[in-house]
Curated annotation (Swiss-Prot):
Keywords: Bromodomain, Chromatin regulator, Nucleus, Phosphoprotein, Repeat, Transcription, Transcription regulation. Component of the two forms of the RSC complex composed of at least either RSC1 or RSC2, and ARP7, ARP9, LDB7, NPL6, RSC3, RSC30, RSC4, RSC58, RSC6, RSC8, RSC9, SFH1, STH1, HTL1 and probably RTT102. The complexes interact with histone and histone variant components of centromeric chromatin. This is Chromatin structure-remodeling complex subunit RSC4. GO terms for cellular component: chromatin; RSC-type complex. It comes from Saccharomyces cerevisiae (strain ATCC 204508 / S288c) (Baker's yeast). The keyword Membrane does not apply. PANTHER family: CHROMATIN STRUCTURE-REMODELING COMPLEX SUBUNIT RSC4, SWI/SNF-RELATED. The gene is RSC4. SMART domains: BROMO (SM00297). Present with 8570 molecules/cell in log phase SD medium. Component of the chromatin structure remodeling complex (RSC), which is involved in transcription regulation and nucleosome positioning. RSC is responsible for the transfer of a histone octamer from a nucleosome core particle to naked DNA. The reaction requires ATP and involves an activated RSC-nucleosome intermediate. Remodeling reaction also involves DNA translocation, DNA twist and conformational change.
């Protein structure tokens, strides 16, 4: 039998290039293994270690998230699912004191006070052990760094679910502003922002640190880059994705930004300049997001200048039972990996996994089997509306929430977060309003020229009835006399709004206007809550053809008293309202007003028919119920 000669790759027309990085373990030749600090995080400045946070049903979230990541990134995770074989790598257990694998992490319980931080330390132990045992410039070490990065990204999304807002046009504009700020940052600007007055002097202020990260690495120049980095990213791509609406939520954008700099950490040696620049830009980006972007976003939202919205599905599940439940854990993982899972099918699976028990749900009253009512707020004062909306999803969770004391403490802590009162920054709001004030509201003194006086007082007929009731009738409870005088020559048109409060049942008033010119030359209008009110003068003019008896009935004795006998200011002739000269010159109008309970808006408008000059007086009258 003739043995055929195997064709070489070059003879078959293939390339003789071999990958630089080979899979598998590459143990170090050193006899002494470097020390591994198991209690120190890789990045102590990360918000995952700085903040005190909690994810409901954390064990279930970990298991679900790791399973999905393994399924998506099999090539990266395959070396870390199980512990190394004692048969093929016996020396591993002599050099590594605390071996760790994904299966070990999934089997542990992290639902206690320091559970989240210990979970992160166990995850980082994957790459710490790998770097201690293998050569640093090996594929397995690079993969271990990416495993830790991907897991921490998912935890970052879940941790910040309550502020992972949807990106609308206003939020997009803010993100673009801070992205451009990072792109234009120099070493001097970054140090001034991070260190303040203690920043070193004589730093470079011309070269932008972001230039090496703007575009993707060229495949022809560094083909081995794509053997290591499984998710390449560049700042220009992030900016383009943000502008075209590729990111639906804020942390989708944030994680891609962090991915740019993490890829530089993975590929380059820690002593390289680009590695240090990536660290600097990461710290500066975290500063911009945590110290400037989110506080500004919250401030704008409290002032009503921006609308912040959540993903309804994941947030409603998060709020169930104070943020607990298997549906919540599944929602967190699904939202983090929604591009790779069919949403509807997985939601059904999560519902099927819930172990409902309708016979052990304790409500108020006389039974365990009735539906929830709004009176059941004692079960959870912040979430009883959620309980009513989704009783089946929640009832199985109440039993689980009562199982341990730690769960109750976590729920109570979540409730206290819901009760947190936002701190409204009134100074910023006032500054913005002052900058946009119109000329109408400036503080320049501008006296009234057309309106000489506005006089508002109680209705005399009703007051007389209240103080002197008829024989056999019940006296009125309202016997207060009120009067308010507004002199135009002492007031400013730029401060034309006045307010006062009346006692209950004080709903009938009379308004008397005193002008500087005849009514023939001016046009007046009084509105109550945007409804026009006719004056007594107009009523009299419309009934001139009626008998004198009817005219007296229309005007009434109160009118005569108001016009002839009403005096102000101790009887000074110059301050008499409605004197005989006013009647002859026809410069006085009287309006009968009926107010409603609550806040009423009166506006008196006067316009000169010749010069078309207009003057206003606004009155806000609050009638107590």
């Amino acid at each position: 039998m003739v043995v055929k000669k195997r064709k070489l790759a070059t003879e078959a027309g293939g390339s003789d290039e071999r990958p630089k990085y080979l899979p598998g373990k590459h143990p170090k030749n050193q006899e002494k293994t470097p020390h591994v600090d198991y209690n120190a995080p890789l990045n102590p400045k990360s918000e995952l270690f700085l903040d005190d946070w909690h994810i409901p049903k954390f064990n279930r979230f970990i298991s679900f998230t790791l399973d999905v990541l393994i399924d998506k990134y099999k090539d990266i995770f395959k070396d870390f699912i199980k512990l190394p074989s004692r048969k093929f790598h016996p020396q591993y257990y002599y050099k590594i004191q605390q071996p760790m694998s994904i299966n070990e992490i999934k089997s542990r319980d992290y639902e206690y006070e320091d559970g989240p931080s210990n979970f992160l330390l166990d995850v980082e132990l994957l790459t710490k052990n790998c770097q201690a045992y293998n050569e640093y410039d090996s594929l397995i070490v690079k993969n271990s760094m990416q495993v830790v990065m991907l897991i921490e990204f998912e935890v970052l999304k879940a941790k910040n679910l309550k502020r992972n807002y949807l990106i609308n046009s206003e939020v997009k504009a803010k993100l673009l502003h801070y992205l451009n700020k990072l792109v234009d940052a120099t070493e001097k600007k970054i140090n001034q922002a991070l260190l303040g007055a203690s920043s070193p002097k004589n730093l470079d202020d011309k070269v932008k640190l972001s230039e090496p990260f703007m575009e993707l690495v060229d495949k022809d120049e560094l083909p081995e880059y794509y053997e290591i980095v499984h998710s390449p990213m560049a700042l220009s791509i992030v900016k383009q994705n943000l502008e075209i609406g590729q990111y639906s939520k804020i942390y989708d954008f944030i994680i891609d930004m962090l991915l740019v700099f993490q890829n530089a950490h993975i590929f380059n040696d820690p002593s390289a300049l680009i590695y240090k620049d990536a660290t600097t830009l990461t710290n500066y980006f975290n500063y911009l997001i945590q110290k400037e972007f989110f506080p500004e976003l919250q401030d704008l939202n409290e002032r009503g200048e921006i609308n912040l919205e959540f993903d309804k599905f994941e947030f409603e599940n998060y709020l169930a039972i104070g943020g607990g439940g298997p549906a919540a854990a599944g929602a967190l993982a699904i939202s983090a990996l929604d591009n790779d899972i069919e949403p509807e099918s997985n939601r059904e699976d999560l519902i099927d996994q819930a172990d409902y028990d309708f016979n052990h749900f304790e409500g108020l009253g006389n039974g365990y089997n009735r539906s929830l009512l709004t009176e059941d707020y004692l079960l959870n004062p912040n979430n009883f509306k959620k309980l009513i909306a989704k009783p089946e999803t929640v009832q199985s969770e109440v039993k689980n929430e009562r199982s341990t004391t730690s769960d109750i403490e976590k729920t109570n802590s979540l409730e206290s977060e819901h009760l947190k009162i936002p701190k409204y920054n009134v100074i910023k709001s006032m500054q913005k309003e002052m900058q946009s004030l119109s000329e109408q509201h400036t503080m320049e003194y501008k006296p009234y020229k057309l309106i000489q006086q506005i006089y508002i007082f109680s209705s005399k007929n009703l007051y007389s009835q209240a103080t002197k009731p008829l024989l056999g009738s019940r006296p009125s409870c309202n016997q207060n006399w009120v009067e308010y005088i507004f002199n135009g020559n002492e007031l400013s048109q730029n401060e034309n709004a006045f307010s006062f409060m009346l006692q209950p049942m004080q709903t009938f008033l009379t308004l008397q206007s005193h002008l500087t010119s005849s009514l023939k030359d001016t046009e007046t209008l009084l509105t109550i809550n945007k409804e026009p009110v006719k004056s007594r003068t107009s009523n009299v003019n419309s009934n001139l053809s009626q008998p004198q008896q009817q005219e007296n009935d229309v005007i009434g004795n109160d009118t005569k008293q108001d016009i002839e006998n009403l005096t102000i200011g101790g009887g000074n002739n110059n301050d008499i309202v409605g004197n005989d000269n006013d009647k002859r010159n026809n410069i006085t109008e009287i309006f009968d007003i009926r107010l409603s309970e609550g806040l009423n808006h009166l506006m008196f408008r006067c316009e000169d028919k010749i010069s078309h000059e207009t003057e206003f007086m606004n009155f806000w009258i609050n009638v107590l119920p």
